[in-house]
């Protein structure tokens, strides 16, 4: 398992570089889900590749975020983790650049079918402009997936981050 950010390097700069380098699956550990999603939306906009941005959680299912106005449209019948991964696999036929942010996927990642699907997707997505980003407060990564998923620890915001977010 490649674990990133044990130093003071900007983790969001690292994530942007990883997306440019076609890293297929990232696992971000943080307690600040909204902040992480907002930063990921900013990265998607900065990469200027017309990314389609999707968000999934086990309560709301899969939604597509409009990067221009921030609205989200939920897709029907994609609530279960296996359905979600099958949907992502089916999208490799399309040429669109896509980011899928999965909240709290650690609850499902140890299930046999999920492990196999994630491994297969990690092997497949590296040839496309599609990325899965797991965002969770808990690092729970099965040994079988350690080679395929890059872990990035997102630190709590520092003084500079807090000052810049309060400046209008």
What spans do the regions from the language model cover?
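ATP/nucleotide-binding catalytic cores
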Residues: 2-168
């Amino acid at each position: 398992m490649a674990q990133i950010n044990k130093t003071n390097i900007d983790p969001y700069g690292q994530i942007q570089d990883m997306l440019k380098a076609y890293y297929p699956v990232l696992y971000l550990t943080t307690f600040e889900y909204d902040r992480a999603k907002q930063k990921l939306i900013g990265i998607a906009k900065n990469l200027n590749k017309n990314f389609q941005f999707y968000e999934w959680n086990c309560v709301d299912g899969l939604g597509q975020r409009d990067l221009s106005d921030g609205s989200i449209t939920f897709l029907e019948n994609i609530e279960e983790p296996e359905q979600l991964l099958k949907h992502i696999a089916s999208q490799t036929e399309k040429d669109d650049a896509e980011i899928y942010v999965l909240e709290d996927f650690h609850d499902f990642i140890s299930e046999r079918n999920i492990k196999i699907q994630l491994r297969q997707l990690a092997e497949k997505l590296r040839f496309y402009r599609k990325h899965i980003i797991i965002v969770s407060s808990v690092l729970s990564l099965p040994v079988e997936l350690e080679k395929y998923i890059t872990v990035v620890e997102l630190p709590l915001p520092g003084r500079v981050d807090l000052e810049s977010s309060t400046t209008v």
